[in-house]
């Protein structure tokens, strides 16, 4: 249900505030217990060293603040009957979020052995950061989580991604003041310029200033309040402040701040949805300033702890061996008065549970945090409508991504009412030839517009901001809450999100073994404007290594595709858009490219992942080939086919096999990757003992790494990108990296037995062609006519 001021509750009574405090104290008690205890959860016996874990792990400092936020979110969710989700940026405060899930019952529903009684509490405590237990952060194992928060910077972009196209959802986002110093977080404040108050939900940022990181003060906590206010207002927010260290006063102030913020959200949404307001609203946020490690030990060993950086992790570190630490821990735990919070059986008392919402309204049970439950099949139209006609291989050209743009346009159109598909990118949609989508939807934009602007749309579903971090964060949040999307990016600059994709793959790998986590739509990358066609921008834009990075990740969760033409791109994209729980990387060109395969051939080839192009080679089946010319990627495919044509002309007696690889993981052994080939398959395709000249899109050593255990690896010779780049002609890029057709012919002559002497004159002609290229481009500034005007001639 959307926020509505008619549902705004009155200020909480003293009795209700006492109940909120009881809930907060219970959550704090449970958080401390998880960090320290493995037995005696209710302190029914005096605390002894054997009750304490031998290895103390976890983070206390942020936990009381997270517990405060969770407690007060419970109140407003229940009072206003809200659909809500919370993104916990300080994910190292896992004990707090786990404590609240246990209190509300969602944890027991997910893990029935962790019962809401003394025995279940003991198991909850022992399992935390314990071998065979649960991680220390707000990991995928945590009900209600879409954001682990281990690597900082992405909380707010995840929150906005969750809110897009969920008009009835309120996403609270706790931002630690340490995380607020990261670059991705700093940029993601601008997400409010893209939030549509008509079709999207609301994000309520809660900036938690507890003052310290691991060992240093935080920047924002030390700013004067007026300067901090100016900063946040400059970001487009309307901050509401809560400051204090007295629990009763802070509870009252937090309740008031939550109501104020939600009332403002309701007014913004009502103005946009009912009154037609179109100006960019100033969304509320809460600035919460409470002590780090609040309610914990004030001093330890004579040094201040509470409200200092020393409270960050484990304030009492020698509890098993230091009697004073043990006594201090017991006093700390008993300060929460657990006998008031839990009955004799260990169940939470009614006062603790009074403010907790029911059923799926609970933060740990919301279906929005288990997005696969909400996911619908994406209506991808039949590919035949978009297929380019191919009478003969290489007889025509198309721009592959432009062809894909037509498909994406119609996916956008088919989801107009559903609003569950988005395209994100860092100001590159048109550059990457996908602008056909603008016929179905515009670019999301809530700022003012000028007459020169094009395709801006307050209700658009194309998201463009020049921050790869924010693009990925938006898309991850969108996918994790049950929708579909595609991230289009220049190949060289997708490396900016290397670390983000690490975290997403880890998330997917864990969720695959959690039966209660429903599969989500895959994270799909379209990498274009790639290394071989960045001759105009130069060396800085030439970097094909993202594929290497991805293939280091969990094999069950990553896929890499290098379609060689428009129809194979359509087939790969169709597969990726329909898939679940993967990271799919598609590398494709946007420049005119020869059309090699019909749609039916493309589908079959992509299903195989790698195959012989018999129409391109000269083997007739009467004997094994003399050489295998292999390729992966659009430009390497062009150069391999041009080399095959040269060989056919100059060395017609050679039996040449041409192999194209579209799914690069096929090169791996089947035991190492689900898409890998058996040794029998590999040897059948590449032979066991014949030279293989492999033209690869990226760094050549990746192919060696993938195939190093194969029988014929000693005969494998790979050409690819060798970090030779500049602003030059397209063909000069491949010549500089020894990937050109002439070099490939020379490689064949050098590696097929008997050719070194017999074909020496041919080799010399290839060398001469490379020199002629060198001289020509330096005089004319363009490639040789024999290269620029080259066409494929079918074997006779």
Curated annotation (Swiss-Prot):
NCBIfam families with a match to the protein in the record: PRK05261.1-2, PRK05261.1-4, PRK05261.1-6
N-terminal signal peptide: none
EC number(s) reported in the record: 4.1.2.-
Protein name as it appears in the record: Probable phosphoketolase
UniProt cross-references to PANTHER family, sorted A to Z: PHOSPHOKETOLASE-RELATED
Cofactor: thiamine diphosphate
Superkingdom to which the source organism belongs: Bacteria
GO molecular function, one term: magnesium ion binding
EC main group: lyase
One record GO biological process: carbohydrate metabolic process
Family, as annotated: Belongs to the XFP family.
This protein's UniProt keywords: Lyase, Thiamine pyrophosphate
Organism phylogeny: Bacteria, Bacillati, Actinomycetota, Actinomycetes, Kitasatosporales
Pfam family, one: XFP_C
PROSITE patterns: PHOSPHOKETOLASE_1, PHOSPHOKETOLASE_2
């Amino acid at each position: 249900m959307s926020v509505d001021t008619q549902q705004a509750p009155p200020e909480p009574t003293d009795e209700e505030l006492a109940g909120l405090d009881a809930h907060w104290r219970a959550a704090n008690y449970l958080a401390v217990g998880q960090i320290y205890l493995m037995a005696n959860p209710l302190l029914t016996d005096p605390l002894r060293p054997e009750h304490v874990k031998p290895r103390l792990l976890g983070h206390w400092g942020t936990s009381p603040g997270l517990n405060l936020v969770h407690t007060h979110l419970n109140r407003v969710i229940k009072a206003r009957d809200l659909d809500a989700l919370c993104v916990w940026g300080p994910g190292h405060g896992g004990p707090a979020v786990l404590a609240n899930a246990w209190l509300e019952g969602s944890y027991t529903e997910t893990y029935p052995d962790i019962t809401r009684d003394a025995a279940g509490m003991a198991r909850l405590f022992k399992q935390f950061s314990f071998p065979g237990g649960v991680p220390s952060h707000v990991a995928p194992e945590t009900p209600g989580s879409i954001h682990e928060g281990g690597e900082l910077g992405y909380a707010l972009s995840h929150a906005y991604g969750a809110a897009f196209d969920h008009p009835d959802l309120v996403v609270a986002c706790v931002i630690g003041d340490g995380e607020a110093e990261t670059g991705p977080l700093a940029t993601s404040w601008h997400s409010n310029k893209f939030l549509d108050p008509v079709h999207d939900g609301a994000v309520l940022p809660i900036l938690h200033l507890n003052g310290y990181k691991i060992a240093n003060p935080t920047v924002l906590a030390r700013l004067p309040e007026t300067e901090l206010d100016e900063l946040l207002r400059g970001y487009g927010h309307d901050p509401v402040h809560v400051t204090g260290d007295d629990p009763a006063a802070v509870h009252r102030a937090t309740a008031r701040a939550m109501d104020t913020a939600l009332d403002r959200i309701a007014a913004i949404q009502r103005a946009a949805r009912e009154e037609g307001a179109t100006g960019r609203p100033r969304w509320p946020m809460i600035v919460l300033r409470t002590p780090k490690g609040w309610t914990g030990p004030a001093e330890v060993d004579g040094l201040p702890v509470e409200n200092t950086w020393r409270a960050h992790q484990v304030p009492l570190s020698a509890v098993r061996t230091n009697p004073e630490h043990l006594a201090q821990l017991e006093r700390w735990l008993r300060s929460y008065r657990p006998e008031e919070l839990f009955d004799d059986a260990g169940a939470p008392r009614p006062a603790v549970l009074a403010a907790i919402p029911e059923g799926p309204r609970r933060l740990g049970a919301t279906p929005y945090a288990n997005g696969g439950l909400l996911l619908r099949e994406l209506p991808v139209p039949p590919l035949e409508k978009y297929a380019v006609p191919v009478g003969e291989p290489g007889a025509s050209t198309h721009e592959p991504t432009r062809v894909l743009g037509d498909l994406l346009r119609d996916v956008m159109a088919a989801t107009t009412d559903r609003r569950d598909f988005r395209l994100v990118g860092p100001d590159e949609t048109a550059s990457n030839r996908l602008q056909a989508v603008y016929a179905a939807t515009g670019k999301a934009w809530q700022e003012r517009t000028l007459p020169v602007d094009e395709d801006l749309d307050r209700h658009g579903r194309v998201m463009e901001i020049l921050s790869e971090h924010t693009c990925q964060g938006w898309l991850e949040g969108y996918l994790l809450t049950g929708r579909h999307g595609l991230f289009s990016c220049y190949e060289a600059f997708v490396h900016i999100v290397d670390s983000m994709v690490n975290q997403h793959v880890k998330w997917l790998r864990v969720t695959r073994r959690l039966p209660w986590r429903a599969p989500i739509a895959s994270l799909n990358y379209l990498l274009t404007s790639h290394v071989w066609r960045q001759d105009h921008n130069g060396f800085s834009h030439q970097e094909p290594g993202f594929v290497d990075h991805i293939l280091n990740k969990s094999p069950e969760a990553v896929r890499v595709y290098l379609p060689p033409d428009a129809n194979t791109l359509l087939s790969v994209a169709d597969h990726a858009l329909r898939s679940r729980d993967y990271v799919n990387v598609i590398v494709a060109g946007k420049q005119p490219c020869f059309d090699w395969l019909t749609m039916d051939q493309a589908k079959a080839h992509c299903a195989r992942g790698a195959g012989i192009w018999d129409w391109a080679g000269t083997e007739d089946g009467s004997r094994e080939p003399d050489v295998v010319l292999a390729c992966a990627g659009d430009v390497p495919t062009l150069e391999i086919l041009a080399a095959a044509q040269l060989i056919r002309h100059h060395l017609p007696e050679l039996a040449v096999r041409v192999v194209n690889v579209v799914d690069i993981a096929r090169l791996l052994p089947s035991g190492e990757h689900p898409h890998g080939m058996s040794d029998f398959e590999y040897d059948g395709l590449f032979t066991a003992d014949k030279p293989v000249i492999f033209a690869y899109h990226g760094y050549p050593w990746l192919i060696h790494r993938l195939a190093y255990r194969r029988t014929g690896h000693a005969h494998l010779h790979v050409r690819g990108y060798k970090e030779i780049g500049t602003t030059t002609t397209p063909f000069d890029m491949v010549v500089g990296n020894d990937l050109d057709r002439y070099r490939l012919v020379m490689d064949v002559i050098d590696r097929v037995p008997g050719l070194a002497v017999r074909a020496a004159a041919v080799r010399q002609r290839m060398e001469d062609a490379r020199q002629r290229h060198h001289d020509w481009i330096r005089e004319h500034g363009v490639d040789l006519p024999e290269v620029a005007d080259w066409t494929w001639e079918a074997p006779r």
